[in-house]
């Protein structure tokens, strides 16, 4: 005998959640579908509730490998509540499984506009960038569908959601980040990284620092073991007055090469711009231990010294 389903939307959704947690995805999908029909029959205009039900059913389809229905349900969820993170991530995963990499890239990128700390989206962007470079070549960005601009209201809505939503998105963050950093690049990846770094260097010579940052970033996606790529990108951030980013990149560069003089110098410049004179002075001192006669560093030390007193 078929199980008797509850008739109220909240109970149906709760039962669906329970079935999903128990790995009964087909049953969960049926419960979410019934909840949707009940909600629509009531003529209730509750787009958020309806959107969540579509998104939950999409998660069931994804678990069962039914990517096309997952995409369909996510699209319905997003039509009701645009720029919702969960349906965007689920649709991106489904597109990726179907090897529709440009579409997956757009959805992952949209998530990062809403919250740039969502690890699964960062991981997804990295995978899609490599796949698109392989399949479409160096001009792959020109062949992408347009990426929607996320309104500030959508970002505010996400930030005002209960912290559980944020915790769920951040789950296993440190583990995944470590896995990415520890990934050993192949010989092909290293070669590709080198070519992209050189393209970045050429753009710097032409004064196009924004484009150069993109090239260095693509290079680091292929191989994040090159200290010079980080310190070169740091230079671009300095020119664009993005001092915090410059400090981060110099720190990464120095982790890979503790005697990278340019990284010490650029981090000292960034610290000085951020009025962190103590850290700036420490970086110059470390630099001068490696290169005691470095003229620009000696000059910068004098400038920083004046601000220390």
UniProtKB/Swiss-Prot annotation:
Keywords of this entry: Chaperone, Cytoplasm, Isopeptide bond, Membrane, Mitochondrion, Mitochondrion outer membrane, Phosphoprotein, Repeat, TPR repeat, Ubl conjugation
SUPFAM superfamilies, sorted: TPR-like
Ranges in coiled-coil conformation: none
Residues recorded as bearing Phosphoserine in the entry: 160, 186
GO BP field: protein targeting to mitochondrion
Gene Ontology MF annotations: heat shock protein binding
GO CC, alphabetical: cytosol; mitochondrial outer membrane
Record-listed cross-link Glycyl lysine isopeptide (Lys-Gly) (interchain with G-Cter in SUMO2), residues: 197
PROSITE patterns associated with the record: TPR, TPR_REGION
Main location: cytoplasm
Alphabetized Gene3D superfamilies for the sequence: Tetratricopeptide repeat domain (1.25.40.10)
Membrane topology, record value: Peripheral membrane protein
Disordered: annotated segments: 161-189
Family annotation (InterPro entries): CiliaryAsmbly_MitoImport, TPR-like_helical_dom_sf, TPR_rpt
Basic and acidic residues bias: start-end ranges: 164-178
Family membership: Belongs to the Tom34 family.
Subunit structure, interactors included: Interacts with HSP90A, VCP, ATP6V1D, KIAA0665, AMPK, and DMAP1 through its TPR repeat.
Protein name, entry field: Mitochondrial import receptor subunit TOM34
Gene: TOMM34
């Amino acid at each position: 005998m078929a199980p008797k389903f509850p008739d109220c939307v909240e109970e149906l959704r709760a039962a669906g959640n329970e079935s999903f947690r128990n790995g009964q995805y087909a049953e969960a999908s049926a419960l979410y579908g019934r909840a949707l029909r009940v909600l629509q029959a009531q003529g209730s205009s509750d787009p958020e509730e309806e959107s969540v039900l579509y998104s939950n059913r999409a998660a069931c389809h994804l678990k069962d490998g039914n990517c096309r229905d997952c995409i369909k349900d996510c699209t319905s969820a997003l039509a009701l509540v645009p720029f919702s993170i969960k349906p965007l991530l689920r649709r991106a995963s489904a597109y990726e499984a179907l090897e529709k990499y440009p579409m997956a890239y757009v959805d992952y990128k949209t998530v990062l506009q809403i919250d740039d700390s969502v690890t699964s989206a960062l991981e997804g962007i990295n995978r899609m960038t490599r796949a698109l470079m392989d399949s479409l070549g160096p001009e792959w960005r020109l062949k992408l569908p347009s990426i929607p601009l996320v309104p500030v209201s959508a970002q505010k809505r996400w930030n005002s959601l209960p912290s559980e939503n944020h915790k769920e998105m951040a789950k296993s963050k440190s583990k995944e980040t470590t896995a990415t950093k520890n990934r050993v690049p192949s010989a092909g990846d290293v070669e590709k990284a080198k070519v992209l770094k050189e393209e970045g260097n050429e753009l710097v010579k032409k004064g196009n620092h924004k484009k150069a940052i993109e090239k260095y970033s693509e290079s680091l996606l292929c191989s994040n073991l090159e200290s010079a790529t980080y310190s070169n990108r740091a230079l671009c951030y300095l020119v664009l007055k993005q001092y915090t980013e410059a400090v981060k990149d110099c720190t990464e560069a120095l982790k890979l090469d503790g005697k990278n003089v340019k990284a010490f110098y650029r981090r000292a410049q960034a610290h000085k711009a951020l009025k962190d004179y103590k850290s700036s002075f420490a970086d110059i001192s470390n630099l001068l231990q490696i290169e005691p006669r470095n003229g620009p560093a000696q000059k910068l030390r004098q400038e920083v010294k004046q601000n220390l007193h």
